[in-house]
Amino acid sequence: MSGKAGFTPEDPEDSDNRHGSPLFEGIFTALNWMTVLPVPGASVFDRTTGARVMASLPFVGFVFGMFTAIIMWAIGPISGVIHVDGLLVAVLIVAFWELLNRFMHLDGLADVSDALGSYAAPPRAREILADPRTGLFGLATAMLSVLVQVAAVASLVDSTVWWMICFIPVLGRIAGQVTALKNHHAFSPTGFGALVIGTVKFWWIALWLLVTPALAFWCAELISPLSPLTSVNTPFVAGPFPAAINPAWLGGWVAITAVVACVFAALFSRRLSRSFGGLNGDCIGACIHLGASISAVMLAVVANAMV
């Protein structure tokens, strides 16, 4: 995101005319800012652009999930010939997530951890937040968050609900939306935070909280419970879940997980706002990464319960 987003010079006469379709501008600009994908973004950067990007943020998570599903299905036939350890697959998936977003959210988490761990007054904390160097707090927090994700994904890989891995990036980004709700403000008038923080409406989050579990229910109905890594002879046999596994319950658990991640993001954002005198883009990244870690753990609980 750094270097990709910032306010464009104001031109009151044609600023609105330079905006494209809200839907497509939001989606494509979100992919342009939040990933390494060569997707064209908006031509004008203002809070309208920022709002559209934040409204589309979970869609970016679904793109991550789509690529994750492709990775899983590509590894499936290989596992029919040679053993592919679930832990190795988990490492590859989490590494792919980080590479796809240029370690952006992990960097935000590290910066926020250093600043928060300093217990400094807001002015000094903001200086630490802007420091490009990473300290012990940042390194340790980033490492632990990645390890949690790897361990949780490894549990899911060999489970009957392996497809839930694809929802982890989505749930983390819904949590990230909470950081930019209208009751929050950016501590700087410039930069990415000023573009997006305070632009998100609650009903946007509520809509994603309905759509995501519905898609999880659909996946539970249509995708085989057999893991592509453990089903050697028929790695991709489609079929219904056993009667003991209720797809509606799985969709409900995804909804509960999303709500928990959002509640965490709301509480954590309040804490960060008090510590820094406002929020910035790093705070959004930290909430996304930690929200994804929390979601991964909660989904892994389901996987372990079904082993």
From Swiss-Prot:
Q: Which residues cross the membrane?
A: 22-42, 58-78, 80-100, 137-157, 161-181, 212-232, 248-268, 283-303
Q: Name the domain of life.
A: Bacteria
Q: Where in the cell is it found?
A: Cell membrane
Q: Name one GO cellular component term.
A: plasma membrane
Is Membrane one of the keywords? yes
Q: How does it sit in the membrane?
A: Multi-pass membrane protein
Q: Does the keyword Cell inner membrane apply?
A: no
Q: What keywords is this UniProt entry annotated with?
A: Cell membrane, Cobalamin biosynthesis, Magnesium, Membrane, Transferase, Transmembrane, Transmembrane helix
Question: Single Gene Ontology BP term?
Answer: cobalamin biosynthetic process
Cysteines paired by S-S bonds: none
**Can you name one GO molecular function term for this protein?**
adenosylcobinamide-GDP ribazoletransferase activity
What pathway is this protein a component of?
Cofactor biosynthesis; adenosylcobalamin biosynthesis; adenosylcobalamin from cob(II)yrinate a,c-diamide: step 7/7
Q: What EC number(s) does the entry state?
A: 2.7.8.26
Cofactor(s) the record lists: Mg(2+)
Name the predominant localization: membrane
Catalysed reactions, semicolon-separated: alpha-ribazole + adenosylcob(III)inamide-GDP = adenosylcob(III)alamin + GMP + H(+); alpha-ribazole 5'-phosphate + adenosylcob(III)inamide-GDP = adenosylcob(III)alamin 5'-phosphate + GMP + H(+)
What biological function has been recorded for the protein in this entry?
Joins adenosylcobinamide-GDP and alpha-ribazole to generate adenosylcobalamin (Ado-cobalamin). Also synthesizes adenosylcobalamin 5'-phosphate from adenosylcobinamide-GDP and alpha-ribazole 5'-phosphate.
Q: NCBIfam families attached here?
A: PRK00235.2-4
Protein's UniProt name: Adenosylcobinamide-GDP ribazoletransferase
Q: What is the lineage of its organism?
A: Bacteria, Bacillati, Actinomycetota, Actinomycetes, Mycobacteriales
